[in-house]
A protein has these predicted regions:
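Short aromatic-glycine-(Arg/Gly/Cys) micro-motifs in beta-strand/loop hairpins
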Residues: 1-20, 43
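GIY-YIG-like beta-to-alpha core
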Residues: 24-30
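Short, mixed-charge low-complexity intrinsically disordered segments
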Residues: 19-20, 32, 37-52
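Predominantly extracellular/luminal cell-surface or secreted proteins
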Residues: 11, 25, 48-50
Length: 52
């Protein structure tokens, strides 16, 4: 079954290479709160369809 989620993408590029983590949230407000709490690297939020 597929559902839509607000996904927080957190990207860090450093001397060790490239790292990306994705956290899926059911609400945009929660995704924005998580994105604001991340201090290192770049973040962006996107609405995506995920298999559950």
């Amino acid at each position: 079954m597929k559902r839509m989620f607000w996904c927080v993408h957190h990207i860090i590029i450093d001397s060790d290479g490239y790292y990306e983590s994705i956290k899926a949230c059911s609400s945009k407000e929660t995704a924005e709160k998580i994105a604001r709490s991340i201090s290192k690297g770049e973040t962006f939020i996107r609405l995506e369809e995920k298999e559950i």
